[in-house]
Amino acid sequence: MRTLWIVAVCLMGVEGHLTQFGDMINKKTGTFGLLSYVYYGCYCGLGGKGKPQDATDRCCFVHDCCYGTVNGCDPKLSTYSYSFQNGDIVCGDDDPCLRAVCECDRVAAICFGENMNTYDKKYMLYSLFDCMEESEKC
């Protein structure tokens, strides 16, 4: 419980994009957004290595790969525009980089929603020391 409180305090100062991504996750999963995924498995959260532990972790692997294709802005810091229309996430930027970041986040949020049945609490706050297998290529 103490660790969850520390993560919550750390996220309180987060502005822009990460709160937007968390909002998308919340809408698609009904969970606490980023808090549910911040240190999940080998790929959710900062960094990422090894083999994705389940379909939920694979969503994060694909998200990391998507961020790797974004050029012209920092995916983790850029603020984009989006809306929810009839339950769908709609990215609304004209700027190609901001639209690409939004699309990466949109696809990941949908993936989390579609794979909620694979979410396993044993992968919450997962140690990267358990992620020593050779990493897959994007």
Curated annotation (Swiss-Prot):
Keyword match Secreted: yes
Entry's Gene Ontology BP terms: arachidonate secretion; lipid catabolic process; phospholipid metabolic process
Source organism of this protein record: Macrovipera lebetina transmediterranea
Protein name: Acidic phospholipase A2 MVL-PLA2
Gene Ontology terms: cellular component: extracellular region
Signal peptide positions on this chain: 1-16
UniProtKB keywords: Cell adhesion impairing toxin, Disulfide bond, Hydrolase, Lipid degradation, Lipid metabolism, Metal-binding, Secreted, Signal, Toxin
Residues at the active site: H63, D105
Cysteine pairings via disulfide bonds: C42-C131, C44-C60, C59-C111, C65-C138, C66-C104, C73-C97, C91-C102
Tissue-level expression: Expressed by the venom gland.
Binding locations of Ca(2+): Y43, G45, G47, D64
Protein's cellular compartments: Secreted
Cofactor note: Binds 1 Ca(2+) ion.
Family (UniProt): Belongs to the phospholipase A2 family. Group II subfamily. D49 sub-subfamily.
Further details from the record: Negative results: concentrations up to 2 uM during 4 days does not induce detectable cytotoxicity on human melanoma and fibrosarcoma cell lines.
Chain's role: Snake venom phospholipase A2 (PLA2) that displays an inhibitory effect, independent from its catalytic activity, on tumor cell adhesion and migration. This effect is mediated via specific inhibition of integrins alpha-5/beta-1 (ITGA5/ITGB1), alpha-v/beta-3 (ITGAV/ITGB3) and alpha-v/beta-6 (ITGAV/ITGB6). PLA2 catalyzes the calcium-dependent hydrolysis of the 2-acyl groups in 3-sn-phosphoglycerides.
UniProt keyword Nucleotidyltransferase, yes or no: no
